[in-house]
Regions:
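Phosphate-backbone binding interfaces of nucleic-acid-interacting proteins
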Residues: 1-181
Length: 181
């Protein structure tokens, strides 16, 4: 069973190192298979708001968007995403951001149009599919308006993926470990 440490911290004060916590849980009979960290390979991805979407002048499947990030800064992003619309809040990897696989975002042109970053989906953010709603698994990850965030915030903090993920082995003698609460 996968358990984000953040979920546990919502109910219990855990003021020790993550690995020490995992070792203590194993000593109680709740075997920890592994400890992984959400977002450890992602850096520089932030929240933006889509202001405009236009058709790319030289490509049928590409769109040219204008987005707002922190401090009213406007960026132009070229994308092939089909699930976005004006007013959506989405994760954007700006120039200099690093995605899993040591993929660095650079300024570039797509079919002659400048792109100053890349929109991200759940896969680029390395969110385990078990934690992603079905309608958010494909395409760009659209943030819910009820989430509390500001433009420019680190998307790992907004989505709670800047945390440890603990995988427990559910042994036959511990059926009580089949749920968190």
């Amino acid at each position: 069973m996968l358990v984000p440490l953040k979920w546990l911290r919502d109910y219990v004060d855990i003021d020790i190192d993550t690995q020490e916590f995992a070792d203590m849980m194993t000593m109680t009979g709740s075997k920890v298979e592994k400890v992984d960290f959400f977002g450890k390979e992602t850096n520089g991805v932030e929240v933006c708001k889509i202001l405009e979407i236009e058709q790319h002048p030289d490509a049928d499947r590409l769109k040219v968007t204008k987005v707002e990030v922190a401090n009213g800064e406007i960026l132009q992003i070229v994308t092939n995403a089909t699930n976005i619309k004006v007013g959506d809040y989405v994760p954007v990897a700006r120039i200099g951001a690093v995605l899993p696989g040591d993929f660095k975002i650079k300024k570039g042109k797509l079919r002659g149009v400048l792109s100053e970053g890349m929109f991200c989906g759940a896969e680029e953010l390395t969110i385990p599919s078990a934690f992603v709603e079905d309608h958010k698994k494909d395409g760009i990850y659209i943030l819910d308006h009820q989430d509390s965030f500001e433009l420019g915030m680190d998307v790992r903090d907004v989505l709670g993926i800047n945390d440890a993920l603990i995988e427990f082995e559910i042994t036959s003698n511990r059926p009580d470990c089949r749920s968190i609460i």
